[in-house]
Amino acid sequence: MKEEIFQIHRYSVGYKIDKQLLLSLKDIFEQYSEKSVLEIRVGCNNNASYVFDNVDECFEFFDKKPYRIIKMEISVMFGTEYNSNQIKLSFDNGDKPLTELRFRFDNGDDYLLLKNKIELCLNNFKLSYRILSRLPIMPMLLTIVFICICVYTDIKNIIFPGTIQWMITGIWIVGSFSIVVFPVFTRIKRNLFPCIEFKIGQNALIEKKNASKRNFIVGTVVIGTVLGIVVNYISNFIF
């Protein structure tokens, strides 16, 4: 009798991919088998893919190249035979973001051992803003601004002419619809709130800049606007 395990696991949360994660995964693979053969395949925004045999080679390449990483596949074979135990871990920050773990094993106990180790490792690299990565953040921001305008005008007893009211409502509806439909807005959102954050080579510098923009949007625009209205509302009772 021969046991065969074919399993695919998909994860909805976002992850940070950096050298520490890749070295941790490599260590897990080598602990299981010294015969492990690693391959890292990276897809970039120049429509090209690059294949590396080790972690250091991958980082050295992207230290010199400005290509934006879109997806990465980490494959490992535990042997040289075609039917050797295999694992493929995929991270995709494209139009259809994905984190996927595939197993082909001939032993159920070994499969569960590796699966648990990899998942424990990934848990340490979850993105702090991963919920925002999945939410339609741009329409939500427009909605928050729209609600803030409504609340503020109500507090101050400001009555806009009918034309202005229709214009504000129209901007909100058209803006929310456009952001959802047009790909350019999806790409902007995917850059500011990525489901997968690749901190590899020059991509780490890009992620640092995006983090500053993300903090400005969440901290200054949203929280600042809400706090401003709350403070204004409270001041009406005090003064």
Residue ranges and their predicted role:
Residues M1-M72:
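Short Lys/Arg-enriched alpha/beta "domain-start" segment
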Residues G14-D18, L22, A48, N107, ...:
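Intrinsic-disorder-associated interaction segments
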Residues I40, M72-I74, L89, L101, ...:
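Hydrophobic beta-strand residues in large extracellular and virion-surface proteins
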Residues N46-A48, D56, T80-Y82, N107-D109:
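Residues that cap or initiate secondary-structure elements
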Residues Y67-T80, P97-F105:
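Short, hydrophobic/proline-enriched secondary-structure or compact coil segments at domain edges
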Residues T80-G94:
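Broad, structure-driven detector of short, well-ordered beta-strand segments within folded domains
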Residues F91-P139, T153-M167, F182-Q202:
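Membrane-proximal, non-transmembrane alpha-helical segments
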Residues M140-C150, T169-R187, I206-F239:
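Hydrophobic, helix-forming membrane-interacting segments
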